[in-house]
Amino acid sequence: MTLIQDITIVTMNPDREIITNGAIRIEGSKIVAIDKSENFPESPASINGGGMVALPGLIDTHAHADQSLLRGLGDQMHWVPFLDKIVDPYLSERSIHHSLLANQLSMIEMIKGGTTCFLSPNADPTDDFNLLSEASSNIGIRAIFCRFTTAKEKTRAWVNNLTDLNQRNNKLVDVWVGLDIPRVQGDTAHPDFYRDVRQVCERLGTGLAYHFCSEFEDSGYMYNCL
């Protein structure tokens, strides 16, 4: 048993209570109790928190974790040419191992900053999801990889792939659908495909992520086209 004392604890209980001069009791890998320090017996395995603040883990709901190696490229560029000139060429040329390294870098940086769970909205279907899952488990961060899925794919193929990926025994990692939708002029909408994807996700009990009105331009396009 380990006891971390002399900390301010920000809780997630119904009252959103903040406990000053608090303590956290840990057994094995689990937090089993939090309370005022004075309410715990002295423990030889005590750690003095030095008045620091203990926060619940943060959740990043939109993290392009596989693009960390592009940092510094395309600064101040509009998002459309950034995709055309930087992101798309990178994705077409990178290897599985480059993707793994990029994701690992993002995971480590997130953990250091207090993020304990993230969602990657457009995970490349050519990535090795077993390697990504192993990396996530080794680093100790929860991950949701949304497999990028387009109307060009045969439904049975991506459904079988999604089913297989979610049958792995990894409690830290889930694989959802990262849906390809139109965002700029020239893109084509596929309403029947979107309905099929929704039905598949409902049947499999899995999640769905997509970009929607994330920029000024595609908000107008969405309004007129969908």
Language-model regions: role of each:
Residues 1-42, 52-53:
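N-terminal metal-binding scaffold of metallo-dependent hydrolase/deaminase domains
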Residues 7, 24, 29, 51, ...:
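Divalent metal-coordination and catalytic microenvironments
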Residues 12, 64, 123, 149:
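Flexible loop residues that form catalytic
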Residues 49, 89, 115, 136, ...:
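Domain-wide signal for the mature, well-folded portions of proteins, strongly enriched
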Residues 69-101, 140, 214-226:
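Active-site gating loops and adjacent loop-to-helix segments of metal-dependent hydrolytic enzymes
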Residues 77-128, 182-189:
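Divalent metal-binding segments
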Residues 127-226:
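Metal-coordinating catalytic core of metallo-dependent amide/deamination hydrolases
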